[in-house]
């Protein structure tokens, strides 16, 4: 292309005589011009290649930075989620520590309350009716028991009242069964010893009696008899 272009610009070069100084000088100038043009074209091609390489390198760099940015963003989101989970877990642990801090103490106090109640129940009713000092002492013991239970309640200890409810092995301890065809099976019909809970946890299960032979049991028995 460059040779054809040079020939088109200098159509008489081939007519020059190299032995003629003037023609030889013209040929030298033409050769210099040709070389300069080729060098300029080469530099332009190199510059274009370098520009393309720079563009490719920049594009690759941008792609790498975008990938790094995505990875860092993902790491940041995971770290934020972990921090939030840690905050919630710590908050829950602190709340549990506050709620259940008195668990062992409360359990011991319930034993004391049980002893006070047994002492009161051991006093004959006729003795209370005839002995004023004994009656006064019994009233004092009862007030002490009541105040103790109220103090425990202020610290999150609640009395379980399961009578009439379905038996729950997490909060109740079955001591005996009571035949009762009018109630569904495993209904709490009697509380032998009060149970207590603190927060969502059982502090002491209620000792109870549960019904047996209710409607469901009767239906089952009927089915068994029919099969027999």
From Swiss-Prot:
Any one GO molecular function term: protein-folding chaperone binding
Organism: Brucella anthropi (strain ATCC 49188 / DSM 6882 / CCUG 24695 / JCM 21032 / LMG 3331 / NBRC 15819 / NCTC 12168 / Alc 37) (Ochrobactrum anthropi)
InterPro entries: GrpE, GrpE_coiled_coil, GrpE_head
GO biological process, one term: protein folding
Family statement: Belongs to the GrpE family.
Gene3D superfamilies per the UniProt record, alphabetical: 3.90.20.20, Head domain of nucleotide exchange factor GrpE (2.30.22.10)
Subunit comment: Homodimer.
Phylogenetic placement of the source organism: Bacteria, Pseudomonadati, Pseudomonadota, Alphaproteobacteria, Hyphomicrobiales
GO cellular component, one term: cytoplasm
HAMAP family, sorted: GrpE (MF_01151)
Record protein name field: Protein GrpE
UniProt keyword annotations, A-Z: Chaperone, Cytoplasm, Stress response
Subcellular location: Cytoplasm
Known function: Participates actively in the response to hyperosmotic and heat shock by preventing the aggregation of stress-denatured proteins, in association with DnaK and GrpE. It is the nucleotide exchange factor for DnaK and may function as a thermosensor. Unfolded proteins bind initially to DnaJ; upon interaction with the DnaJ-bound protein, DnaK hydrolyzes its bound ATP, resulting in the formation of a stable complex. GrpE releases ADP from DnaK; ATP binding to DnaK triggers the release of the substrate protein, thus completing the reaction cycle.
Spans annotated as Disordered: 1-31, 209-228
Source organism superkingdom: Bacteria
